[in-house]
């Protein structure tokens, strides 16, 4: 059974969904996404987990109170805890993809008592790289375009330079409605297209500048596994996952698909995630 609700956070109302039965599992989405990004994944996992998905502040149905401001990671973690609190949960398993993976790392570092285990899929954390300069140069150009040509030009460069997305597909992502037949995928893509400006102005740079406290995670002993996509085309993302895993002394598990596999192939992705969560989950914590 699917239930929906809203919880008040600090300066925001957070929309969230709950489905399934079993150990609680919080799915954290990355930049521009919303709860619908995980609909397929959550549905495939709901037979074994109580799955929570939500819209992060400023995205889709999670409205801000006051002026928008650059993303603050501690605030993102507090929002995730607000969803757990509203659901009556002391702790949960956590999965995050992309920017949501960075939030999962922050939760494990900052709030270890609330995280039973975390699976971290391709976090964009260039701070862990031995030479992050070439990767950061892409984001310096995004900043320049944002200041001189506007958010759409900056977003277009981001999609092309980081995701390798062709120009015609970027144009569709900015205005997907006329190009897609009615249905859940169209509804999702129309919703998230309205998040692109907020992501470009307030989230991208903050995610890239985030420095995960890997020493804190090592010290507190939260079970963490990194994940990378077998089909991921950006070698820097793969390297970030591998380096983060090595510094944590954690596994780096190969998942099917690429960076957006949780949306594109949820069934195959869920199968690997389910097995990994079962291995990571501390015994006796259900």
List the model feature ranges, each with a label:
Residues 55-59, 124, 256-258:
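Short beta-to-alpha linker loops that shape the active-site pocket of alpha/beta-hydrolase fold enzymes
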Residues 90-130:
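Conserved hydrolase catalytic core segment
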Residues 27-31, 98, 229:
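Glycine-rich His-Gly loop
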Residues 77, 81, 155, 266-274:
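Short, amphipathic alpha-helical "lid/cap" segments that border enzyme active or binding sites
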Residues 134, 138-141, 145-243, 247-251:
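Alpha/beta-hydrolase
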Residues 52, 56-93:
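Active-site loop/oxyanion-hole signature of alpha/beta-hydrolase fold enzymes
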Residues 246-286:
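Catalytic active-site module of serine/aspartate enzymes centered on a nucleophile-bearing elbow/loop
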Residues 5-64, 69:
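Conserved HGGG/HGGXW glycine-rich cap/lid loop of the alpha/beta-hydrolase fold
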